[in-house]
């Protein structure tokens, strides 16, 4: 998984590495293009389906499952999946796997303990998502949850000394404005609301979830950059801590009720779908994101907002008014602008600036044209668009 770099984007070894695909035969290039669009489809479906499935499972009539048990089950399945992947990497040799895990988890215990912090935050974040989606329409949650881009960017600047372009700062302001409009529409919108839903609680939960996502994602990225452990090993360690911490949270919040009614109380096929999506969704994205760049991830998030909104209209009777459409449009535009590579951002900035006559250079006749920069994609280094938590959520 060395190809997965910071923020889940494709790692680049140098200027030539990005453009290497252009030098491959047409068949290889076409296959890579197909994989990119498959990645886009997978990201769109995963982003939208998780939110919609949680909303659907939490609003079904009848006995409601305990969200804390779903979080624990997702961590267990995620950890087992990573264990199987590591087992496959060791070519099915149990002895080699045991020795590897003993060395990586127990002998290097300080590295393992570093994962306790992001694991605690991710466990909290997953529980907050259930609270938020239970109290907000799926489309409203999907739009508001894009604040994680803002929090991730701010924590990246503070913790990793990362610099953002002026276009990215402008897109973050646009993002905040769009979310504020959507929340204003939610607060002032008419129409009956279910009695068991509290938009204020939902907003507080989604903001706390975005803050935790931003911090934990950047913290996890810092750990990955400072160590040689594989992504699957780190996810296994996170799964171990996540399971333990999730059980503690379950006992503290709903221990008596779970003991009385059972761990799997209220579980239906829809609930199992949520658990599987939460467990395997992030791991699936970790694989397919190898073939997708930041622009595709921006499109995926934007399209998932549209898909969530359309599905919410059909499934939950969600009403889209002009204020929501304006806010969602600003968020979609901000997501796309933020995900643009630096080269494209500079092109947009230069295109918007006035050009003067002396700056226009005419090539004298008879001389070969200067080398084109388009064959050198060194400027296509991108800032992380999604937090590293895309690998573990």
UniProtKB/Swiss-Prot annotation:
Subunit structure: Interacts with SLC35A3; the interaction is reduced in the presence of SLC35A4. Found in a complex with SLC35A3 and SLC35A4.
Record field: catalytic activity: UMP(out) + UDP-alpha-D-galactose(in) = UMP(in) + UDP-alpha-D-galactose(out); UDP-N-acetyl-alpha-D-galactosamine(in) + UMP(out) = UDP-N-acetyl-alpha-D-galactosamine(out) + UMP(in); UMP(out) + UDP-alpha-D-glucose(in) = UMP(in) + UDP-alpha-D-glucose(out); UMP(out) + UDP-N-acetyl-alpha-D-glucosamine(in) = UMP(in) + UDP-N-acetyl-alpha-D-glucosamine(out)
Keywords for the protein's UniProt record, in alphabetical order: Antiport, Golgi apparatus, Membrane, Sugar transport, Transmembrane, Transmembrane helix, Transport
NCBIfam families hit by this protein: nst
Protein name in the entry: UDP-galactose translocator
GO biological process, one term: UDP-galactose transmembrane transport
Chief localization: Golgi
Pfam family, one: Nuc_sug_transp
Compartment(s): Golgi apparatus membrane
Gene Ontology CC entries for this record: Golgi membrane
Key word Membrane present: yes
Role of this protein: Transports uridine diphosphate galactose (UDP-galactose) from the cytosol into the Golgi apparatus, functioning as an antiporter that exchanges UDP-galactose for UMP. It is also able to exchange UDP-galactose for AMP and CMP, and to transport UDP-N-acetylgalactosamine (UDP-GalNAc) and other nucleotide sugars. As a provider of UDP-galactose to galactosyltransferases present in the Golgi apparatus, it is necessary for globotriaosylceramide/globoside (Gb3Cer) synthesis from lactosylceramide.
Membrane protein topology class: Multi-pass membrane protein
Signal sequence segment: none
Region entry Disordered, spans: 353-393
